[in-house]
């Protein structure tokens, strides 16, 4: 292998409703991982400035990054980041969507309704954890994606994320304060804040565990349960429902899909 191939890097970008997750791969190794806020009004120049600063801090040369893959659930930011990479990195991103090979057969009423991030997670799980699998991605929304024993995507569930739930209870009431989402020491809160933290945290665990159990029952077999997303580690502290916690699952899925679509 020549030196150029050995140092070839890939930028994987997962654009979500709350944050933009950016990973830099060298081969299979994730060299760096950053999160930027998802701000539709932010200009491409602003995102480029942030990203170039992070690259400099990590001692990664921008000129090395001409391979880029993205998945997005925020169309305006898709356009913004395409501009970032075309202008500042001279790279045209591969955007996960129609016509892109993922290795995942989708058995849904309308396959086009399935979000790109969910397809990417399924692609990662299919490679990393073959067989029946339930992927629980905990972000702005919490998605439950199910793979059959043969690795086909057969559907799932969508629920509010834990932060979304906490925000809703504040916005829909007049006296309840904003709270930090933590793993409380006990369920019985001794004041308003601790009572809210208990209800949000343990109530959310109940939601996740019940949906996983129902999906397992409908599958008729034990499926591996993989947690990912920004709140995966925090929720896994209070639940034994997960077999694996893999915060970088989406980035890994993007890497696999890029390999499948290389020209």
UniProtKB/Swiss-Prot annotation:
The record's InterPro entries line, in alphabetical order, gives:
ATPase_NBD, Type_III_PanK
User: What name does this protein carry?
Assistant: Type III pantothenate kinase
EC class (word): transferase
Cofactor binding mode and count: A monovalent cation. Ammonium or potassium.
Q: Which residues form the active site?
A: 117
Q: Which cofactor does it need?
A: NH4(+); K(+)
- Gene3D superfamilies membership: 3.30.420.40
Q: What is the lineage of its organism?
A: Bacteria, Bacillati, Chloroflexota, Dehalococcoidia, Dehalococcoidales
